[in-house]
Amino acid sequence: MQNGKIKPENLLRRSPTNRKLTTGCEILDGCLRGGISCDSLTEIVAESGCGKTQLCLQLSLCTQLPISHGGLNGSSLYLHSEFPFPFRRLHQLSHTFHQSNPSIYANYNDNPCDHVFVQNVHSVDHLFDIMPRIDGFVGNSKTRFPLKLIVLDSVAALFRSEFDNTPSDLKKRSSLFFKISGKLKQLASKFDLAIVITNQVTDLVETSDGLSGLRIGNLRYLYSSGRRVVPSLGLAWANCVNSRFFISRSDGSIVKDRSEKDENCSSSVSRSAKRRLDIVFSPYLPGSSCEFMITREGICAVQA
């Protein structure tokens, strides 16, 4: 490796990592065959309110778990690009996480929130400005929890108002997609990090050439809240990520009894809006899905 770049002839010599980051839910981990892969870019696509940020917050805490418990024994960097960061929700989840894993913090004067580093990113240029600092932060971390997870929530927000739909802007935007994903993949490979990126959806607009219905991955169509949707940023961005998970929301609710064992369900009966995670494409996962709900304690999947 020279200047942080991997030579093509060395790609086949590298041993792929098998390390996974638990989602904090045993059923959801089963769907993902252990959780989120390290040394990889994982994208979570969903409309607002489906739970993609909730899952990312939960992953940020689960990173601190020991490797024997599905964690990475590390800290996380949360890059957020829209809305105020949900500190209140993070503290709520942190309290539950601390109660469930007191031994991690018993001999230290800290708490789970101390190991979730939050950075606002307000533009593409800003993201590129802080990339060198991220590289230095990961490489020179001397804390008891080295950085092991980077979350970018969300990538679509960075491009929402900066570019028009002109050929020149679309070309420039595609180039930036590959630069961003290339740098994140470089960090993931160099430091064996898990990288999670959220993306939004737009309503499907049918076109005369039929390209709007182009199939990418395991699902022919994507539906959420009764609408047919497509991931934002198009095919160029889809080619930049290793795995894509789609979270949808539908009418109705899930009622889950406490007899279905899951640490994230505290009441005897829990009721929540119905949500579903689908694996759209992944090099290491077959197509599958899992229903879940969001409780006060976190994401709680439902056994099929």
UniProtKB/Swiss-Prot annotation:
Biological process (GO), any one: meiotic cell cycle
Chief location category: nucleus
GO cellular component, one term: nucleus
Factors inducing expression: By genotoxic stress and by DNA damage.
InterPro entries: DNA_recomb/repair_Rad51_C (IPR013632), DNA_recomb/repair_RecA-like (IPR016467), P-loop_NTPase (IPR027417), RecA_ATP-bd (IPR020588), XRCC3-like_C (IPR047348)
Pfam family, one: Rad51
Family annotation (CDD domains): XRCC3
Family matches, as PROSITE patterns: RECA_2
Tissue spec: Detected in various tissues. More expressed in reproductive tissues than in vegetative tissues, with the highest level in young flower buds.
Protein family per UniProt: Belongs to the RecA family. RAD51 subfamily.
Subunit structure and binding partners: Interacts with RAD51C.
Name under which the protein is recorded: DNA repair protein XRCC3 homolog
Gene encoding the protein: XRCC3
